[in-house]
Amino acid sequence: MVKLAFPRELRLLTPSQFTFVFQQPQRAGTPQITILGRLNSLGHPRIGLTVAKKNVRRAHERNRIKRLTRESFRLRQHELPAMDFVVVAKKGVADLDNRALSEALEKLWRRHCRLARGS
């Protein structure tokens, strides 16, 4: 049976790991959210989140966005390519309800899967 856990090894933790993705990313985005990805050599995907206070003022909104993004990644982790992903929240993401945010993330994960197959 497939495990849908979210252990520490599936997270980007250090600034150098984030910098690695920012150097040569594949981009997939909507006006409210962008997912940057770069192939890694680990054999499994990892995720990092950036939700700036400048773009999402209230802490509970930032936490909601991060929680929904982590959950979306956790459920799709076995379908995603072995890439490091950085999810960047932009202005207006707090205006999306949970369903709209989840649908936007699903669309972006699918786009990254297509990009990885094409490269």
UniProtKB/Swiss-Prot annotation:
It holds the Pfam family Ribonuclease_P. Its EC number is 3.1.26.5. InterPro entries: Ribosomal_Su5_D2-typ_SF (IPR020568), Ribsml_uS5_D2-typ_fold_subgr (IPR014721), RNase_P (IPR000100), RNase_P_CS (IPR020539). Keywords: Endonuclease, Hydrolase, Nuclease, RNA-binding, tRNA processing. It catalyses: Endonucleolytic cleavage of RNA, removing 5'-extranucleotides from tRNA precursor. Signal peptide: none annotated. It comes from the Bacteria. One of its GO terms (cellular component) is ribonuclease P complex. One of its GO terms (biological process) is tRNA processing. GO terms for molecular function: 3'-tRNA processing endoribonuclease activity; ribonuclease P activity; tRNA binding. SUPFAM superfamilies: Ribosomal protein S5 domain 2-like. The keyword Transport does not apply. Consists of a catalytic RNA component (M1 or rnpB) and a protein subunit. RNaseP catalyzes the removal of the 5'-leader sequence from pre-tRNA to produce the mature 5'-terminus. It can also cleave other RNA substrates such as 4.5S RNA. The protein component plays an auxiliary but essential role in vivo by binding to the 5'-leader sequence and broadening the substrate specificity of the ribozyme. Belongs to the RnpA family. This is Ribonuclease P protein component. It comes from Escherichia coli (strain K12). The lineage of its organism: Bacteria, Pseudomonadati, Pseudomonadota, Gammaproteobacteria, Enterobacterales.
